[in-house]
Amino acid sequence: MFKHLNLSKKVLAAGLASLVLASSATFAQTKSVAVTAIVEHPSLNAVKDGVYEVLQEAGYKEGENLRWQFQSAQGNTSTAAQIARKFVGDQPDVIIAISTPSAQSVLANTKTIPVIFSAVTDPVAAKLTQSWDGSGTNVTGVSDMLELDKQVDLILRIVPNAKTIGMVYNPAEANSVAVVKSMEAELAKRGMKLLTAAAPRSVDVSTAGRSLAGKVDVFYTNTDNNVVAAYEAMAKVAQDSQTPLIASDPPSVSRGAVAALGVDYTELGRQAGRIAIRIMEGEKPGDIPVQTGEKMSLHVNPSAAEKQGITLSEELIKEATEVIK
C-alpha cells in the first residue's frame, strides 16, 4: 500500500512539475506589443490592422502568446504623452507608434524599449532618428514619404492649368511642415506656387480651407492628422467652392477626395509588424534601416470629381487600382 502511495506521489509530483514547466514556457514565449496612434482615422487604423495581421500570421495569438494593447490619443498631444508614459511603465517587448506625434512622445520617455514608428513622413526631420540607414539607438520604422514630383504630376493630369495649390495643415506637426517645404520647392520648379492655411486642431480644418477658397486652383492634402481626421469637412469646402481636392492617402478618396496616389497603409502596418517580429526574435532596432512604403496605389472618385466641378479622364480611371463609385 505504501509503495502505491509513494508511486502516486511521485506521479503527481512529476505531473505538477511538467505543468509548471509548461506554464513557464508559455509565459516565456508570451510577447507584449503596445500600439498607439495620435488619432483614429482610416489611414492610421489601416496601419494598426496591418501590424495585427502580420503578428497573427506569424503565430502570435492574442490571449495565448501575445499581449496586445492599443490606445489612441484622440488627437491630443498631452494624451499622447500620458499614453507613452503608461506604455513605458508596462515594459512591453515593442512599442509601435503610429504617426509622428505619437512616436515623438514615446521616444521622449524611453531610450531602451524598442520603438517602431509608422505613418511618419520624414523621421529625420522629426528628430526620431539621425539616419535612414539605422539609428544605432532603440528606434526604427516605416515611412510613408512620397515622391512629390509624382504628386504634382497627378495634380496636373487632373487640373492641367493649375497654377496655385492650396494646403491646409497643422504647423505643429513635423510631417506636414516637411511636406510643405518640399512641395513649395517642387512647385517652384514648374512655375507654380503653394498657399497654405493653418489648422492647429481638427475643428479648424473647415475654416482654414474656406480661407483658401477662391485663391487656389486645387486643394492638396498630405497625411496631416488634423486634416485627415476631419476630411469630410475638407471635402465639403472643396465641393462648395468647386475646387478639386486631391489627397496623398488612398483612404481619403472614399471620403471625398477626387484622387490619391499613395502608399497602401495596411501594407505599411504589415511592414512595421514584420520589423516587430525581427526585434522580438533578437535583432536590435538600431541595426534595422528605416523602410519606406513598398506598395503604391491610385484611387479615384469620379462622383466626387463631378461634385467639385471636374471630370476625370477615362485614361486615369482605367489606370486606377480602385474606383470609388
Model segments located where?
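Short hydrophobic alpha-helices and adjacent helix-cap/hinge residues
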Residues: 2-16, 27-325
